[in-house]
Amino acid sequence: MAHVVIGTAGHIDHGKTALVKALTGTDTDQLAEEQARGMTIDLGFAFLNDNVTIIDVPGHEKFIRNMVAGVSTIHMAMLVVAADDGIMPQTREHLQILKLLNIPQCVVAVSKTDLAEDEEWLDLVELDIREITDGIFKSVDVIRTSVNTGVGIAELKNLLEQKAVTVDQSTNRGFFRLQVDRVFSMAGFGTVTTGTVISGDLKKGSTVDVLPGNIKAKVRGIQSHGLDVQSVQLGDRAAVNLSGVDKDKVFRGSELALPGKLKSIKKFTAHIKLASEMKKELKHHQRVRVHLGTAEVLARVHLSGKKKLLSGSTANVNLDLEKSTVAASGDRFVLRTYSPMTTIGGGTVLTTFIPKGVKVNSWVSALDVDPVQRFEQLVDSFSTQPYTISEWALLNQCTDEKVNKWITKLDLQTTKKDIVFTHKILDESKKIIVSTLNIFHQRKPLRRSMGVDILQQESRLSTIWLEEVVAMMKKEGIVKFVESGIALTAYKVKLVGGTAELSRKMENNLTKVGLKPLTTAELSQKYNENDKRVLEVLHVLKGDKKVSEIENGIWMHTENIAKLRQTLIKHFSQNNEMEVTDFKNITALTRKFAIPMLEYCDKQGWTCRSGNQRSKGANL
């Protein structure tokens, strides 16, 4: 069976620590102050058997933060209620916290039964317990115990072990996560962190991210149940010896994770439910305490379009944190007021990011609590910047396999490059591209195509998504590739009026000059036109394959280029080599044009350069 962690719960002085000692033989009050005061202040740990750990939490209201840190990583609870006291304030608050954290199973131990008045009193206490736990857990077993007489101890231990076998640990995300609840240093070893593995597994020698802080650390050693082990897995309690990180950089609330899977955050979107017992409403921008995993972080609550929330209500909210922490979608947390500290509710992390360009209030309010439906909403929110399967896995803090399951369930689409999209996203992207090209063709009627970079900037589609959509549109005959750019298939350049006349004159001139190319500036000067208009006409002629650009700003008619090729053929039929001087002689060109023309011939494969000599090229 997978390792199971049980957490205690209950009012101060109801005998939680004594009961743990009776079950395990371990006194979990290790601090001198705890032993002196006779009360649990911080978390204590004991082993019920090789597969079950018990975390003993403090019962005093002043140490609720420690209690929440302890139970945030447990799989089931052991609620302790003293027979002589019955239900007390911290009994109720601890139960409320267990409910908010969605702890599925609970065993109740009625302690100190030797102090009860009689059996009838015990029956009343048990009745109160069943009433207060009704609706929180699927079922509750109540065992009457006494550490003084030994009554019920063996029965309680057997029940805990039986229940542990049935614990559902299907929350595994597929990658390693450990929420740190203790940090200390050992001479000769360095920094040691302890916590419960809440996802994945970890091997000795691995590298982990220490968050927040984004520190890389090496796993020097691992212990579980006091023994050196090579690895730990989901559910295990572990002490992890780290190298590469100082003790003061890690604290309760830190998290160890597989590198690259989690990020430090300072805000997240969540679905919260306020406790029905809450006496005051929760106000917009109110300062609260967020107990997330083993961390406690102060935050401001941003209600979406509301000024306040009443007790018992639910809502999607944004939480702006005052310091960085770690969270993943699906993580549960507890909300407490800043001062005085009382538990007011809890919630579930929906997402740790908000898409750019959305109306935050309406977007947050509409987010679905169900992770599958929420994934579809998120995919639709990134209509111009669709993500790949791996990117979605990172954003949702899960595996590629989980994302693929969602894709199949929702009947979403993927490209060959694993980009996830819907038919709606594809249709919208196509419309954006068509509209962008239409506007370009209207603004630049003499341009045969729009540069891909410009199309990406104007459409605001991500580069990889634009490539995919354009490829689909080309297959469908909507767009075409022209001159290393993109155009609508139906678009054709039409020269009219003065532009048509300018084109005719320029073409005639480029034909008449023979092997001498002309520059853009020369043509502009000759026809008293600006360079921009001349270039537009030249690109039209180039698209019609009437002229070619030999080099930047140097143009030649294709008929004359063909004549140049014949001139080279004739030269090499009589000579094996050619120097620059030879080329100048056979073309009557100055060095200004001879060099770029020779380089053009090299690119065409008509000539092959070796030092200052050129020989016949493979394409001549």
Where are these regions (language model features)?
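Conserved G1/Walker A P-loop phosphate-binding module
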Residues: 1-57
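P-loop/Walker A NTP-binding module and the surrounding RecA-like catalytic core of P-loop NTPases
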Residues: 6-22, 62-68, 86-89, 94-97
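C-terminal effector modules of nucleic-acid-centric enzymes and ribosome-associated factors
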Residues: 8, 105, 116-121, 131, ...
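Residue-level recognition of beta-strand microenvironments
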Residues: 11, 183, 200, 222, ...
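Residue-level signature of catalytic and energy-coupling elements of molecular machines
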Residues: 13, 19, 38, 56, ...
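Conserved Switch II/interswitch segment of TRAFAC-class P-loop GTPases
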Residues: 57-62, 72-94, 99-123
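Conserved nucleotide-binding/hydrolysis micro-motifs of P-loop NTPases
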Residues: 60-61, 84-88, 103, 112-117, ...
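Conserved catalytic-core segments of large NTP-driven translation/proteostasis enzymes
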Residues: 123, 131-278
